Amino acid sequence: MSYTLEQADILIDLAQQTLRLPKHNKFYLISSGKNGIGEQENSGKTPRGWHRVAQKIGHDAAKYSVFIARQPTGEIYNQQLAQQFPQRDWILSRILWLDGLETGFNQGEGCDTFKRYIYIHGTPDTEPMSIPMSHGCIRMKNDEIIELFGLVP
């Protein structure tokens, strides 16, 4: 199947570290994978290509809600929690779980975005945007991921 930019709900520019919603005229800064760009399993890289939002997680979650394995922990992120768990990869507020649409590139054996658990998700607001720092996911500020969550199908 072939896709066009006109069909896209979300456009991510990894070189510019931006996410656009053309249909809503919205623009956000992001942080992608610190290991660079790529589709390989266990690479820590952010995948390229056509994707869809497979699952939206956290519909009614409070801002700064903490998720582990896509489940709310009951915790609300704050500095004390950050100091208690300094090595935790914080997934906050909302999760958009991505699924690749290109067999052999970002879907299937060894490269599957969905099976790699690649999300668009909230991160602590103290984390910088425009600098690749994630483990492969797309990180956003919490107010912005909450807004995005409400705008995409």
For the regions a protein language model found, what residue spans apply to each?
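Exported/periplasmic cell-wall-interacting domains
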Residues: 63-153
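Glycine-rich catalytic cores of cysteine/serine-nucleophile enzymes that process amide/ester linkages
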Residues: 14, 22-51, 57
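Soluble periplasmic/extracytoplasmic beta-strand elements of cell-envelope proteins
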Residues: 9-11, 29, 52, 95-97, ...
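"…centered on the first transmembrane helix and the immediately adjacent amphipathic helix/loop
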Residues: 56-57, 62
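Short linear motifs in intrinsically disordered
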Residues: 2-13, 147-151
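Extracytoplasmic
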Residues: 5-7, 14-16, 25, 48, ...
